[in-house]
Structure formats: structure tokens, C-alpha cells
């Protein structure tokens, strides 16, 4: 059976990534890589959060992490930041990391298997129910104007 268009799209996105197993992702954070949790609040509340992870919901990711964006977070200092994206199962994070790479953030990658694999591997995880607010930056007049043409 031929792979679906979605399977092909995901495979193409992943072909640019050096994806990390949970233990390797955790070790990378201990060396200075930044773990970015893109899961929506209901998933973070239901399953817990990784201590120290930066919370940036998927719909704001590019604007918060790109160093040229007026809406960037303070950690978005340049193209060489090592961003490790985490979602629930490792699908959305692969697509998100590939987009970050396409925008010039060449060290962006994701966690194989997402939070489910992170938990199964025994990596640090806070209790369900407690959630941190997403990381925000001062809102510019137009997010789109900070990286090219207006949205």
C-alpha cells in the first residue's frame, strides 16, 4: 500500500531533523538546549509538564522563537539556539521543528514519541493539574511585519 500524502509530508519533514529519544533530549537540556512544549493547555493539565520546559503553544511558535520577530521570547537569541520541540506523540513536534528549520533555526528538532515516550522513559515530569502559562512577548502592531510582509 502506498503511503498517504500525510505520511509522505511527515517523512519529508522528519528527513531534515536529527530527532532525539527522550533520554537524549533530556541530556541535551542539561547541556543548554531548550525544550519547548507546544501542547495545548488541556494536555499539559491532563498529563503534567516537563520541569523547565518553555511553554509556547503551536499557533505562536514561529513568532516566539525566531530571533528577528518583535514577538520573540528572550531565549530566541539567534539561529544557533538548540530548540527541542515536544508535543503529545511526536507528530506535531516534527512538523513544527521542520518549519523552524525552514525559517533558519537550523538546530531545531523534536522528541521521538513526544510526551508519551518521555513519560514512559521515566524522564522528569510534573504532576497533572498544574500548568504554566504560555510564554508571551509584547505584542507588536503586526506580527507578520516582524519577519517580512504583513500577514
Please annotate each region the language model reported.
Residues 1-34, 41-83, 89-151:
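Rhodanese-like catalytic fold shared by cysteine-dependent sulfurtransferases
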Amino acid at each position: 500500500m502506498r503511503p498517504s500524502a500525510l505520511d509522505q509530508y511527515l517523512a519529508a519533514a522528519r528527513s531534515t531533523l536529527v530527532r532525539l529519544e527522550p533520554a537524549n533530549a533530556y541530556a541535551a537540556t542539561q547541556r543548554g538546549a531548550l525544550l519547548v512544549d507546544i501542547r495545548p493547555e488541556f494536555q499539559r493539565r491532563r498529563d503534567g509538564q516537563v520541569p523547565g520546559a518553555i511553554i509556547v503553544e503551536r499557533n505562536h511558535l514561529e513568532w516566539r522563537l525566531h530571533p528577528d520577530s518583535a514577538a520573540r521570547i528572550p531565549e530566541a537569541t539567534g539561529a544557533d539556539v538548540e530548540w527541542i520541540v515536544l508535543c503529545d506523540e511526536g507528530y506535531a513536534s516534527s512538523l513544527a521543528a521542520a518549519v523552524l528549520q525552514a525559517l533558519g533555526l537550523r538546530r531545531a528538532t523534536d522528541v521521538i514519541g513526544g510526551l508519551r515516550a518521555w513519560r514512559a522513559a521515566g524522564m522528569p515530569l510534573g504532576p497533572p493539574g498544574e500548568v504554566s502559562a504560555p510564554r508571551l512577548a509584547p505584542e507588536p502592531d503586526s506580527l507578520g511585519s516582524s519577519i517580512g510582509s504583513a500577514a
